[in-house]
Amino acid sequence: MKSTSKRTFYPGDEWLYFKLYTGIKTADDILIRSVFPVVKKLMREEIITKFFFLRYSDPDFHIRFRVLVKNPKDLGYILYTVNQKLQRACKNAQIYRIQVDTYNRELERYGKDHIEFSESIFSADSECVLSILKILCKKDENYRWMVALKMIDCLFNDFGLSLTEKASYIEKMSLGFKQEYGFDLSLIHI
């Protein structure tokens, strides 16, 4: 299905959007044991073509999980498959609420001509992060931030940024993050 620069996708449209309410500490387990396997299955079956997730609070912490459906006739199958895969986490009270919601694309942030490309990057990034999380779950917690920094550096290298450009970009992103989320560095004691 073509979704060029369309802003809003309601449940039943080509983007299916789940909110999985969970704890911050259980999120990785849900991503590794539930989300990743169901995504791999649906991709292998060619039922979905893209997916991505992000962690969010509104104010309750949850995983926002979106899939691009190849054919709307498969929506029932997708809902059933996701439901079956999430049952263990629900029964163990790792997930305490699941919502299917409306996906509103951030066209102002990513651009109407670039949103589909951005979603492809989100999908590739989500798949990469899930693969790494699967490996890191068996490692010391310190590996997590080291791997994150290495991934950021590799991405910067892919864009050919110099050390000065990397530092400038990180500073700009840091300021944007602080403004958007009200982050106060004075609260952190290092």
What are these regions (language model features)?
Residues I32-F36:
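Short amphipathic alpha-helical segment that frequently serves as the phosphate-/nucleotide-binding helix
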Residues M1-D13, K19:
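Extended low-complexity, compositionally biased segments
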Residues E14-L16, F61-I63:
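Short amphipathic alpha-helical segments
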Residues Y21, K25, P37-M43, I47-D58, ...:
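Internal, hydrophobic cores of structured domains that mediate oligomerization or house catalytic pockets
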Residues I188-I190:
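Conserved small/polar residues in nucleotide/adenosyl-binding loops
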Residues T26-L31:
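Short N-terminal binding/cap micro-motifs at the start of the first secondary-structure element
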